[in-house]
Design a protein with these regions (language model features):
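Bacterial N-terminal signal peptides that target proteins for export
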Residues: 2-9
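Short, polar/charged alpha-helical segment
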Residues: 37-56
Length: 132
């Protein structure tokens, strides 16, 4: 299989990224989403769950891409956003090839913690294969 096909077929699991950046905004969680319907829905789902289960206020910023959101996460401008394992691996960590899905998540999780002090939380439980 080609790299491109592997990328398209790889279950791009959506994960939460969470930092401790909300220290300055003690009662508000700031969520960022990418400019896609799927991301908008995930952001709203996160908002509802956080408000329901914590009582914290939630603000959503819609429409940024990984190249904007990731640096903002590092600066503490956002607290959480849904991201795809393939994007985190290839775009953020700038790796040349994908790992098998069963090892990608664990390796990605460790590298983000070491390099950025960001935590990947558990998968949502579905994947985005870009297939019909």
């Amino acid at each position: 299989m080609t790299m491109k096909r592997d990328l398209l077929l790889l279950p791009l699991l959506a994960f939460f990224l969470l930092t401790t950046a909300c220290k300055d905004r003690k009662n508000t969680i700031r969520i960022a989403t990418k400019p896609m319907t799927e991301q908008f829905i995930l952001g709203e789902m996160l908002k509802l769950l956080i408000e329901q289960d914590t009582g914290l206020a939630v603000e959503i910023t819609k429409g940024g891409g990984t190249s904007n959101i990731h640096p903002a996460m590092l600066k503490g401008e956002f607290d959480i956003y849904p991201e795809y394992t393939g994007t985190g691996w290839l775009v953020v960590l700038k790796k040349d090839s994908l790992l098998p899905p069963d090892t990608l998540y664990e390796t990605l999780k460790k590298e983000y913690e070491q390099k950025f002090h960001l935590k990947w939380l558990s998968p949502y439980g579905f994947d985005n294969t870009h297939s019909l």
